[in-house]
Amino acid sequence: MRLTQGCFSFLPDLTDEQIEKQVACAMSRGLAMNVEWTDDPHPRNNYWELWGLPLFDIKDPATVMFELNEARKSCAAGYIRMNAFDASYGTESCVMSFITNRPVSEPGFYLDRTEGVGRQIVYSIKSYSVQANPEGSRY
């Protein structure tokens, strides 16, 4: 099952050239880039691990691509995404995010049903990879 989070998630994976163009476009608008990774693909997992430091003062897309490639070397078996951060007054938030790296196999999710008090049924989504493997060895 293909994880769909962020921009371009329903399109085929972006090539490095396309990623670099997106980074250049974001930087031309004054956005700061950063790289994040995770091995927990749950849809509500918004807090991925930050790779290195945020690239606030970087003006060259090649530097961002270098950091992305370094993250790919270390975290090749997990998910890696790029974020564009708008630090302008009134926004101060992530305005663009897209996945740049995926594991070879994405086993997907299952629906867990639990009965509570008064026949209340609670559903939760759980990842097959998280259930089967401890953190750090999921992919």
Swiss-Prot record:
RuBisCO catalyzes two reactions: the carboxylation of D-ribulose 1,5-bisphosphate, the primary event in carbon dioxide fixation, as well as the oxidative fragmentation of the pentose substrate in the photorespiration process. Both reactions occur simultaneously and in competition at the same active site. Although the small subunit is not catalytic it is essential for maximal activity. It comes from Detonula confervacea. Belongs to the RuBisCO small chain family. In this alga, in contrast to plants, the small subunit is encoded in the chloroplast. The basic functional RuBisCO is composed of a large chain homodimer in a 'head-to-tail' conformation. In form I RuBisCO this homodimer is arranged in a barrel-like tetramer with the small subunits forming a tetrameric 'cap' on each end of the 'barrel'. Keywords: Calvin cycle, Carbon dioxide fixation, Chloroplast, Photorespiration, Photosynthesis, Plastid. GO terms for biological process: reductive pentose-phosphate cycle. CDD domains: RuBisCO_small. One of its GO terms (cellular component) is chloroplast. Heterohexadecamer of 8 large and 8 small subunits. The keyword Chloroplast applies. SUPFAM superfamilies: RuBisCO, small subunit. Coiled coil: none annotated. This is Ribulose bisphosphate carboxylase small subunit. Gene3D superfamilies: Ribulose bisphosphate carboxylase, small subunit. The keyword ATP-binding does not apply. GO terms for molecular function: ribulose-bisphosphate carboxylase activity. Its main location: plastid. It is found in: Plastid, Chloroplast.
